[in-house]
Amino acid sequence: VAPSRGLGDVYKRQVEEAVDELMKGFAEEDEVIVLTDLTSGSVNQQFFRYRNRPHTHIVSGMNLPLAFQVAMEPQGEYITVERMREMVEEAKNEIKYVNDIADDGDDEDE
């Protein structure tokens, strides 16, 4: 077994144990929203097992606008699947390549 492969297995087990421990801490009626960076990442892969848990939303490729939207949702109400999809679409629209945005103001460097 190559050393890197062994370390990868150890890391995967650690992530799996951490995710399981975290999820065990929630009551069945608790809403759980998981925001991960990479769909193919190890953390997302471990949370994927909980995708059918009631009141659980798992979103990969998250960005700060999405995190803000989720945090600002009304407390005491479950977020619907439709609302989560809306928030994901809104967050996608916030990703911009700023160099392509037209400059309508004066540029002092010119």
Predicted segments — roles?
Residues 41-54:
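Short Gly/Thr/Asp-enriched flexible loops that form oxyanion-binding sites at enzyme active sites
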Residues 12-20:
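Structural motif
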Residues 53-70:
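Short, acidic/small-residue loops that bind anionic groups at enzyme active sites
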Residues 73-101:
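Short, glycine-/small-residue-rich phosphate/pyrophosphate-handling segment
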Residues 31-37:
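Acidic beta-strand-to-loop metal/phosphate-binding motif
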Residues 29-31, 54:
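Short coil/turn segments at beta-strand junctions that form active-site/ligand-binding loops
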Residues 104-110:
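Short acidic DE-rich linear segments
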Residues 1-11:
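Single conserved hydrophobic/aromatic residue that forms the stacking wall/gate
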